[in-house]
Curated annotation (Swiss-Prot):
Gene: GT43E
Full protein name: Probable beta-1,4-xylosyltransferase GT43E
Function as written in the Swiss-Prot or TrEMBL entry: Probable beta-1,4-xylosyltransferase involved in xylan biosynthesis in cell walls.
GO cellular component, one term: Golgi membrane
Recorded GO MF terms: galactosylgalactosylxylosylprotein 3-beta-glucuronosyltransferase activity; xylosyltransferase activity
Transmembrane regions: 89-109
Pfam families from the UniProt entry: Glyco_transf_43
Domain of life of the source: Eukaryota
Family annotation (InterPro entries): Glyco_trans_43, Nucleotide-diphossugar_trans
Species per Swiss-Prot/TrEMBL record: Oryza sativa subsp. japonica (Rice)
Protein's UniProt keywords contain Zinc: no
Residues of this chain annotated as glycosylated in UniProt: N260, N366
Amino acid sequence: MVSSRRNTGGIQRDGSLRDWSEFVDPSPSPKLLYSQSYVAMRGLLSSLVSMDFALLSSRLKSAWAAILSQRHTRSPERSKSRGLSCKRLAFHLFVCFMVGIFIGFMPFFSVDVSQKIVSENGRLPFDEGAVDRGMVDGKVKELETIVVEKEVDIIDESEVEESPPVPAMLDDEADFVESAPAIPDINDLDITVRKLLIIVTITTVRPQQAYYLNRLAHVLKTVQSPLLWLVVEWPDQSFQTAEILRSSGVMYRHLICRKNTTSVRKIAVCQRNTAIYHIKKHRLDGIMHFADEERSYMSDVFEEMRKIRRFGAWPVAIHTGIKYRVVLEGPICKGNRVTGWNTIQNIQKKSAVRRFPVGFSGFAFNSTMLWDPERWNRPPMDSVIVHSGGRGGLQESRFIEKLVKHERQIEGLPEDCNRVMVWNFNLEPPLLNVPPGWSLHKNLDAVIPVT
């Protein structure tokens, strides 16, 4: 029985080995083919199948011994492989680091260095060290200026006559050169700079307004530019005045004075001060003149105004109202220097004594005196306006005293003040019954019918 069990056990072991050998992968192991641990584990599994405990214990011992021996044999191999992998990783990191540095310092655009910047030894200035870009730009500008100066000197020299002859041009080129207009020199151009004339006119809606404004507009239209016409109306902008200014052909500004009063003198003061405030606000630089619409002007007086530096005056012909007598009021001059005054005070005994006996239509001044007192050595807080107090010409005289202190500061116009260019004739009738705007909305009755 014992022998039969052993034979059957041996037979089962052989069969078990054959059965397990059928499931073994015949492909070689990637690391170690049929190592000792592999053989031990194979025997262990075969003993488990055969259920032989004595053989199983021996197989376990041999498998354990094989595993221990494999650990001892693999430990130096693993340490060597780990060392090789660390070195390889460090080498890769070093290579990547160097490539990154190289890319970081590589310029992304081409630097164009001028060939003119060359040192004495024939080398570029950045061969020996860092270059200051500002210094390089300065050297480039210096070299360019030197080259331009040398070219100008070469052109200015008398040796230009020895230059080689100019090659002959084609017929088309010759025609083009002859037809091209020559550019004149700037010194040959006849350019005259004229001062701005600021003409202030006060007006109100009344029957003779259209006549006065149109007459003055035609005179101003003949004056050479630049000219600005400041028309100040009370109390509102009327359609009639706006139409006259729009059709005048003169550059204008339509201002209004809204003072609530019925005094003609106070209304005129408000209108003139409105124009003065407008000039101060916008800092208009020119020659300012109060041109009343009732006055008759020659266009020559406006051209004479442009000669004024600070303050200028001229004689005015005034109708006194005594029969047909006309008196000249204004300065007496020797050249352009004022030596005395003509006045109507001898005719009108009741008139007050004036420091400067001249009306608004007889003087003009530089508008910067209104808003730039430091330029004319005047107190900064001394405001120049027209005051409502004063009759018989005192209003104009007090206004002039704000601008000048002595006749030496006044320029007489024209030369020797021997020409009358302004007339003051009061020809306006007291009352007229006229249609508004001098426009007829319906036909009048026929005085002489057509038969």
